Each structure stands twice: as structure tokens, then as C-alpha cells.
């Protein structure tokens, strides 16, 4: 099944609220667990960059798990960022998770480089996947750690519908439709390997971790270390 692109930004306020209220406990907890397991050299403190943060649930989970870290959380949707800022204030995390509106690759992050760059479910929204990988290189330095998790495009629309029924059976129809569209827009591991090679990031590991998710992870090498 060929990829079917979807809108890059979730700009509608109603859609953003529905997304923010959805039950992502299992995949978001899994994101943090996998990050902890794979990035065993993560230092005890630092500043992370969250690319495509949405309403911030991953960033909130990250700083609760790693209490000496803070996060600059970037997204291009004002509706998502407003929900994230409100949630940060309610939970007292507004000084540790800082939300910034930014459209990639045009805009800048608050810092020139970061100790960790992570992203959850941004890649499948991008018409040009190079945007994610070039942004990762742009804000990294030697030994910056990278962790990306996203969906895998299934082999058919029927399989996509099966995954929606299995994992979003109790969600509102707007979210079921979003999930289905996201599966159709996702990339496959072979495509991601090509993307990493073209971005000179093929030293990063790629791993399928469920029937619908992959992760990319590892450190950025020093500038004089050749890409694999």
C-alpha cells in the first residue's frame, strides 16, 4: 500500500482537544520505558528537545521520570500548545516543560543544541521526512542522544482498519479517523533506513517494537567519525 499523506498540523481546536483527551497511556508509557531501556547512557540531568510535542504528554512523562531534566517542547499548532501550557500550569511543570511555537524547518529552537532530542509521532505527519532528520542534526552536537518513535504503515487499508478497531475501539470517531489516516501516512522501516542514510544518520538504530510502532535511537557521533 502506497503512503497517503495527511495534514502536517492539527490546527482545529476541537480536534486538538479530542487528541489531548484521548487514552494514550499504553503507547506513551511504552515510549518512556523504551527510552530508559535503550538510552542507558542518559546523563542524570540535562535539557531535552521535544519535536512535535502536541499537548505535551510525552514531555510531562519524561520530566516526571527524570526529575533533573527540563524540556523545550516545539510544535507548530497554537491549539496544541495552548492545551500544553494549561496542563503544565495545572501540574506545576511550567518551568520544566517550556512550550514554543515553531514550524520546521523554518523556525529555530531556544537553544543551539541539546543533550537529548526526542520525538513521538511527528514523522508520519511530514510530507518531507527529511525535515525531522535535518532538525535532529541541526540541534544536536557530539554525543547528543536521539530517540524517535512513530507508527508503521500497514500492508493494506484493511489491516489499518483492523488496528484502529483493536487499539481505538472506544475512542470518538474523530480520533478513530485520525488514527486510520495516520497509519496510512506512516513510513515503513525500509523507507526510514533510506531516510537515515540520506541524512547521514545511518549509525542510529532502527527497531520495530510492536505491531504498529518503530523506534530510532542512539547517540550522534563526533564530527570526525564517519557515518556508517
Question: What is the role of each PLM region?
Answer:
Residues 143-150:
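Conserved beta-strand signature within the Rossmann-like core of class I S-adenosyl-L-methionine
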Residues 1-18:
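N-terminal, positively charged/glycine-rich alpha-helical extensions of SAM-dependent methyltransferases
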Residues 49, 57-106:
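Class I SAM-dependent methyltransferase SAM/SAH-binding core
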Residues 55, 185-228:
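Conserved Class I S-adenosyl-L-methionine
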Residues 25-44:
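Conserved alpha-helix/loop element of class I SAM-dependent methyltransferases that forms part
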Residues 118:
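A conserved beta-strand element that flanks and buttresses the S-adenosyl-L-methionine
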Residues 126-136:
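A short, conserved alpha-helix within the catalytic core of class I
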Residues 151-199, 205-207:
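C-terminal alpha-helical "lid/dimerization" subdomain adjacent to the S-adenosyl-L-methionine
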Amino acid at each position: 500500500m502506497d503512503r497517503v499523506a495527511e495534514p502536517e498540523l492539527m490546527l482545529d481546536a476541537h480536534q486538538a482537544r479530542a487528541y489531548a483527551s484521548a487514552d494514550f497511556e499504553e503507547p506513551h508509557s511504552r515510549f518512556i520505558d523504551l527510552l530508559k531501556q535503550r538510552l542507558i547512557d542518559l546523563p542524570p540531568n540535562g535539557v531535552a528537545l521535544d519535536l512535535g510535542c502536541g499537548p505535551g504528554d510525552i514531555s510531562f512523562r519524561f520530566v516526571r521520570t527524570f526529575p533533573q531534566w527540563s524540556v523545550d517542547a516545539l510544535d507548530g499548532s497554537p491549539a496544541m500548545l495552548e492545551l500544553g501550557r494549561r496542563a503544565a500550569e495545572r501540574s506545576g511543570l511550567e518551568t520544566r516543560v517550556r512550550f514554543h511555537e515553531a514550524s520546521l524547518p523554518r523556525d529555530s529552537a531556544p537553544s543551539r543544541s541539546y543533550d537529548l532530542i526526542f520525538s513521538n509521532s511527528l514523522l508520519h505527519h511530514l510530507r518531507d521526512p527529511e525535515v525531522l532528520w535535518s532538525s535532529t542534526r541541526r540541534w544536536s552536537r557530539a554525543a547528543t542522544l536521539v530517540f524517535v518513535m512513530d507508527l508503521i504503515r500497514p500492508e493494506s487499508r484493511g489491516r489499518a482498519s483492523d488496528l484502529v478497531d483493536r487499539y481505538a475501539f472506544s475512542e470518538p470517531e474523530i480520533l478513530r479517523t485520525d488514527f486510520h489516516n495516520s497509519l496510512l501516512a506512516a513510513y515503513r522501516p525500509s523507507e526510514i533506513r533510506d531516510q537515515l542514510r540520506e541524512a547521514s544518520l545511518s549509525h542510529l538504530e532502527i527497531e520495530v517494537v510492536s505491531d504498529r510502532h518503530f523506534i530510532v535511537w542512539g547517540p550522534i557521533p563526533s564530527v570526525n567519525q564517519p557515518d556508517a
